């Protein structure tokens, strides 16, 4: 499995999702949410995954939503687009909460906004 917004590996049943934008303290983008929604749905049916570790690359876990990629565009979206975005983000969190596997947030440094929400999921 390959994702553009994070590094994923599964070694001996320990699946690691490492947010991978250290220059921006692993800020979340639309692609990050889409990737998280996809990987969490896939892991639910992957018997080789026993434990999930969610962490960040560099000195920060996750600084929240990337302003130029999410916040600005969200302010310009129409209702149907906002609904799709909200469903995607809710599905990612819901998938994590419903996953029948232990999830460990290995928090390294800052965790703010939506990053704190991920940490608590």
Predicted regions and their residues:
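Short, glycine/charged-enriched secondary-structure capping and boundary segments
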Residues: 31-32, 66-70, 120-121
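Conserved CoA-thioester-binding segment of acyl-CoA-metabolizing enzymes
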Residues: 1-57
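Charged catalytic carboxylate motif
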Residues: 31, 35, 88, 95
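Glycine- (often His-adjacent) and acidic-residue-rich active-site loop
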Residues: 56-92, 111
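Hydrophobic/aromatic residues within transmembrane alpha-helices
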Residues: 17, 54, 66, 118-120
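Histidine-centered beta-alpha loop that forms part of the nucleotide-sugar donor binding/catalytic region
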Residues: 20, 65, 108
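Glycine-rich beta-to-alpha active-site loop
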Residues: 92-121
